[in-house]
Amino acid sequence: MKKLLTLALSLALTAAVGVASANTKLVVGASATPHAEILEAAKPILAEKGIDLEIIVFDDYVQPNLQLEAGDLDANYFQHIPYLEDFNAQNGTHLVSAGAVHYEPMGLYVNPAKAITLDSIPDGATIAIPNDTTNESRALGLLEFNGLIKLDTEAGQTATVLDIAENPHKFDFVEVEAAQVPRTLADVDLGVINSNYALQAGVDVVGTPIAYESTEVAYPNIIAVREGDDREELKTLVEVLQSDEIVNFINETYKGAVVPTK
C-alpha cells in the first residue's frame, strides 16, 4: 500500500511538472514606458492562458527590430507601422504588425524655465524634434496642424525640415533622437515629444503640452513579429493586449496620455 501511495504521489508530481513546463515562453522586447508596463499588466492573464512572458526592455528604436529579425525575440512592442516600414526598407528586415494596441499622441512642450504659450512663441525660437523619419514627420505635422509652419504638399509621411515650405517665424530646428528630446528641452525653447518618452522623463503629459498633433494622424503602436510567424501564442498575446482588462489598465494608468486603439 505504501509503495502504491508513493507511486501515485510520484506520478502526480510528474504530471504537475509536465503541466508547468507545458507553458509556452514568449520573449518580447519593449520600451520601458508605457510598453513594458502594459506587458507587465498582461503577464498574469497570459500565464492563465499557458504563456510565460519574458520582457526585455530597450532604450533605443534599433536593437528591438534587429534582435527580432535575428530570432532573439519572439515579438517587440515599441513602434508604429510607418516606422516599421521605414526600418524594413532601410535595413532589409522582414517584420510585420500582428496587431495594434495603443496610440501615443505627440505634444509640443515648453522649456520649464520659460513662459511660452502657443500664441506667444517668439520668432527665432529653437524647437527640438525627433530625427527619425516618421517621428520627425509627425512632429512637423503637429507644428503645421497648429499653424506654426507649412510643409511642402508632396512631403507626405517622410517630411523633414528640408520640406518646410513656409517658416514665417524663422524657427530653428534641432534634430535629436526621439528619446533625447525631453533631456534636450532645458537647452531649447520648445520640444515635440512622444508621450512615452515624456512619461519616462517624468513630464506631465496631460497638463504641460501647449499643442497636440491631430488625432487623425496619431499612429497606433503595434506588436511586431517576423513575417510568416503566425503562432497561436502570438495571436493570444495581441488578443490579451486588446482585451477589456488591458484597455482599462491603460485608461486608468495614463489618463489620456496613452490611448487604447480599441
Language-model-derived ranges and their functions:
Residues N23-T33, I51-V57, T126-I127:
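Short, well-ordered beta-strand elements
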Residues I56-L66, A155-R183:
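Short helix-initiation/N-cap motifs at beta->coil->alpha
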Residues Y61-G92, K114, A198-G202:
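Pocket-flanking alpha-helical
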Residues E69-Q79, A125, L148, H169-F171, ...:
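Alpha-to-beta junction loops
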Residues D86-A98, N111-A115, D187, V192, ...:
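Ligand-binding "clamshell"
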Residues A98-I149, V247:
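A conserved helix-loop-strand patch within extracytoplasmic ligand-binding domains
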Residues A100-V110, N135-E144, L199-E239, L241-K262:
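Periplasmic-binding protein-like
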